[in-house]
Amino acid sequence: MKLPGKIAIMGGGSWATAIAKMCLAQEDSINWYMRRDDRIADFKRLGHNPAYLTGVKFDTKRISFSSNINDIVKESDTLIFVTPSPYLKAHLKKLKTKIKDKFIITAIKGIVPDDNVIVSEYFTKEYGVPPENIAVLAGPCHAEEVALERLSYLTIACPDKDKARIFARRLGSSFIKTSVSDDVSGIEYSSVLKNVYAIAAGICSGLKYGDNFQAVLISNAIQEMNRFLNTVHPLNRNVDESVYLGDLLVTGYSNFSRNRTFGTMIGKGYSVKSAQIEMEMIAEGYYGTKCIKDINKHHHVNMPILDAVYNILYERISPTIEIKLLTDSFR
């Protein structure tokens, strides 16, 4: 397999749009799978994604669009998946073309619901893609800031670091700095957990807790994340690196963070359903909370922040009560 070959973006949201912008900074052309034909038609007519990051202009002559996932897969060598994790299986069920010989990059910051497996493991287990042909793209990088070409840092993780370096070079630009890692599982789990902790930060903000407490919350969150990672995937990793701690910080504090926004609404008294309807965007942390909770039943890691968020979202315990109990466990 010659990498990267022809690159395909698999998804049509804001992060997919940002990644397409990164790719086209170096690639002559890309393929792009979007579910809706009307969205594709509007994109071609307007020269930008009609629903997400509308300020990012594209030369659509350099993009081959299709709503047929099989057509895109056949014509591509590297598939960058950027669909929300709850919808991944529905998209993949349409596949008739084998993907085990493709190179897969997952930029999905979630766990496959019901299966409770990280996305890289799902591609290996269900589609026979070798682990060395799967990479994870992560880091403290909001799509909105990529659109504005504000300096951002990304990490590409793959068991084969030489392959990771190839993609790091292809995604880098004047506003994107890249690094590589082989901690695929750790980075995927941390990408899920940071969304859970961002919901916690939002809930506390909605309850009018101040910056002082937020600092304590995030300090405890990184410790909790480290305990979980060292249990489920022991490795000599440094969670102070930007792909772990940096991603947690930006997701927990930024106004661009949909998970923090979702949590803030919950803290202000919204129900889960009403918050989801008003946001009109997927807060991955809602699904990630239940998945990590289920996974942790087998590991018994002490995770009071996760437990508090789970109790609020799924057991409908009052945020006021649950966060008060959480404050008593902090140091």
Feature roles, as predicted:
Residues 1-56, 63-67:
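NAD(P)+-binding Rossmann beta1-loop-alpha1 motif at the extreme N-terminus of oxidoreductases
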Residues 56-65, 129-133, 174-176, 301:
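A short helix-to-beta-strand connector/capping loop
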Residues 66-74, 78-151, 167-169:
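Rossmann-like NAD(P)(H) cofactor-binding subdomain of soluble oxidoreductases
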Residues 87, 98, 126-133, 151-238:
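Internal alpha-helical scaffold of NAD(P)-dependent oxidoreductase catalytic cores
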Residues 194, 201-205, 230-331:
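NAD(P)-dependent Rossmann-like dehydrogenase/reductase catalytic/cofactor-binding core
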